[in-house]
Amino acid sequence: MIFISVAESQQGRLNALYRGSVSATVLAPPFDSMARQLGLRELADLRKLDVEYSGTSIAATGGYVKSHPAAVESFLKGYIESLHFMRTQREKSVAAIMNYLKMKDRARAEEGYDYYVELMPPIPYASANGVKTILQSLAHQQPKAVNASPEDFYDMSFLKKIEESGFVKSLGAKSASTRAHDRKS
């Protein structure tokens, strides 16, 4: 059995699966429904398995984080703002999905939006249990992963600082004032 790395794009993984280059892969909406339409069978829905898994990560080297803390904080603020935009601007977000994935099928784009808006937290804190699941899955390749501490793989200090500064709450206030302005216009 050949299993393709999740480092590939979803479109690339779907193409490889359809061509028979791999036996299985991981797909999320809208690519999972595309696979079903092509006659491929779903083996499991990770959302229904009650397994916490860190599927989306933001990474930087320790050296970069130490030497460029302002850039790290600025990036994270932008990322948090984009998550807020996604949650509060459905139509624009669906349009962006269709544009960047070159999709014509609005229903599939909405399916992808609904999946990700539910999946992505307002503040992207790492999950110790999610990282532990990944470490356990790597144990056959990296025996040291079994005994590794999940906390050694992430630094939440920047996110805590951003949250404590009131930045995240201010996004909600901006949304409310924008909606009020839109109603007056």
Locations of the language-model features?
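Secondary-structure end/capping motifs
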Residues: 67-148
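Short beta-strand-to-loop elements that line the ligand-binding cleft
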Residues: 1-9
